[in-house]
UniProtKB/Swiss-Prot annotation:
Protein name per its UniProtKB record: Cuticle protein AM1274
Residue positions the entry lists as glycosylated: 83
UniProt domain Chitin-binding type R&R: residue ranges: 20-85
Modified sites of kind Pyrrolidone carboxylic acid: 1
Region described as Disordered: spans on this chain: 1-22
Amino acid sequence: QLANEPPIEIIRQESTDNGDGNFNFLFETANGIYKEVSGYPTANGAQAMTGSFRFPLDDGQIVEVSFTADENGYLPVSDFIPTPHPIPAHVLETLAIVDELVRQGATWDEQGRRIT
């Protein structure tokens, strides 16, 4: 927030904590920021959460993210999260050839030249 701008109003805020590891939290601001999280204990005694958040970009687009955080880590899902390009078929074929050569005992020097 810039120094000369007024604070952004929180138009909705809710929070519940059952005291047993289950909780819900939600807030929404006047400028379109929103977050909602539900937490719960897992069978192994850890804490897990699911939720979502959204916020506007300067160009008017709305970024929306849903997520799970549990024993598998933080797993966000959003159209705005970059995904790697597919590996080209010729690269996959080359990697398969190298794997086979390694299985056959091939070795290479520091410059990548095959020794055996």
